[in-house]
Amino acid sequence: MNALKRFADYFFKEPFSALKNKNGSTDKGEWLAWRPIFIFAIIFSLFGLIFLARDAGISGDEFFHVFHSKDVINYYKTGGADKAAATPTASNNLPYYSQSPDTFIHLIINAFNIDDYMPYRHLLCNILGWLGILYASLLARRIGGWRAAVFTCVLLFLSPRFLGHSFNNLKDIPFASACIMSIYYIVKFLDNLPKIKISTAVMLCLSIAFATSIRVGGLLMVAYFGLFAIIYYIYKRKTLKPVFFKTLLWSLGICVAAYILCIFTWPYALEGPVSNVYDAFTNMSKFQIAIKQVFEGRMQWSDNLPLYYSPKFILMTTPIIVLLGFLLSLIFLHYNRKQWFYYMVVLFTALFPICWIVFDRSNVYGGWRHLLFTYPSMVVLAALGLNSLLNLIRNRYAKYAVGLAYLLLCINPISHYIRNHPYEYVYFNQFVGSTKDAYGKYEMDYYYHSLREAADWVKQNAKKDSLTTGDKIIVACWHIHPANYYFKDDTAKFQTAFVRWSERGNSDWDYAIVCTTGIEPGTIQNGTYPPKNTVHEIKVDGVPVAIVLKREQKYDWQGFEAMKAKDVNKAKELYAKALAVEPTNETAALGLAEIYLTEARTDSLRADRLPKAAKLLDTFIAANPNHETANYMKAHYYLMNNETDKALALCEKVIFDNYKYEGAYMLAAQAKLQTGDLNGAEDYLTRLLNTGRLSDNLVKTLLQIFKFQGLDDANAYVKLYSLLEQYYLKIGEKKAAAEYTQAIENVMRQQYGRQ
């Protein structure tokens, strides 16, 4: 009760008494009313976040974490016998993460046998997102006062990317909150020196443990603690020298205890408390799975993005008011020089991870969600910058004018929320123009929130027709796990099916839900997307982030099935019918073109089939100018038509559009071989090897080329093994490289009798 009374006195009684006495300032010159304003703002942010998140969909990665949570729980249930949660694979790096929030909520879900469990996951995410807002605000208050705390709270709530991910991203948002919580307690712990408050030490320990129990990158908080403690000790060495060893022991104890706590929630770490944690830390930014995404109007691989990808995305998607405040904080560093240590802490924690990701060329995707943990620090700096400007202005009316300018800059994200809820995170600022201006240039709903609204529309509006092949309406979707969840209570009427956008004509479905994410930007930019059989669109700022398609014909699927049955004539007939309905039908156009190109290998049919293939491909490419398979097939046509230069040019275009497209390199090498350019063919195949697309066909072709170049068997193998040795060294596979080093020595020994 005493604590509650002190709280009420500090935040309400004292400010309101001061207002009544017309004395609204503390001895530091801050208006006391900022205290109750902060309480109102922080409470509003919690309930506002929970209210807005009710309409959120399932995030793109959510089910992977659901499945891993079950593996983690099984690991503990079986006493470690079930090691699925502790065994990383090439396609599953989740054992590198502890993901404690996921595990915690699924323990509750299992305990109460909750069927509709996604809202509970999202509620936990909301609360943890709000925790980040709270601790960022408290950090700002510690440095700049309660007005800075209010600014931080408001700016984080009005940050569309942060708020939108707080709806359902139970990995990046809890990690961001745990990190800012750790930073806050690091500052508080150091501030308290030479005294050591046990409550602060305990909270710092729990914060670091919490961060590391979500993602191994939480160990960065240990490094932060050590770095900032050393700097603070040097700064305050006269005061702190007598308590150096005491402080050192406490600091080590905090870090060791945090490490032990996080290990208990992390199966992979339990299997190897030192080696596995080190392995996870060194591999956390080296995702083995690269994905393609739209950036700067091109489809690009996530492991080959420009160095400025993350910084640019941050600049494009952060509200101008935050960027302005951040800039002001740098401008006013001299003015705030007495607080240099605190500014250094916040600035370093905001910028260092971004710089490291750029330097390390990390494999990142999905905008900058992997860097969300830096954002609370950025916003704290922004709030301090805005606060400093107001502190410097002495004229009351000038303060009002600046405050009004701040409010006007907040209108843009607020209006975005109103127009585009629940897709708050699909946001681009005025540097880009608007979300509409970014359409076709950058990914929109990359976390697939819009699937929920699309599924709801299908459930309410879908009807059987003459094309329906069974008792149920088949709903196709690339993201099958969320689709299954959305339709789990309607299985009497609906059946879900997995279908990729590029293969939508290859299977049976009646309706398809398609997220615009992953659609080739050339198709978007030339206006052929959405296709004409679109019956519903989910839009953000007037552009579709997801669509619902209704099947108009199934000739393409039937033709595809005929080809699988090797009934070429029937396939040709069915593909032609599909094209009569939809001239740019992907399955039909490319399927029929492939048939014609195959038939053109027969001399008697070449003159008839090649022009037909070219016409089909030209029509399709006009609608889909950067379609890799279509352009690759057109390059085949050119090579068959003895237009080698055009074939090579088109192969280069395909490689530019997708540097991992194996067929383009192989076809270009074939073209070079046909012209007798052995070195040119070798160059294409070496480039292919360096993309990581190693195959038996590539190795055999290289060996053949080396022999054509005049090398005997032994030297051809030595040259091949040397290439493979260099490749494996380049990607860090020292063991594989050593095997080829040994193979070279064996060949040389056999050839020349070397000992």
Which residues make up each language-model segment?
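Hydrophobic, aromatic-rich transmembrane alpha-helices
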Residues: A136, K312-W340, S388, A497-V499
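Membrane-interface transmembrane helices that cradle and orient dolichyl/undecaprenyl
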Residues: S182-T200
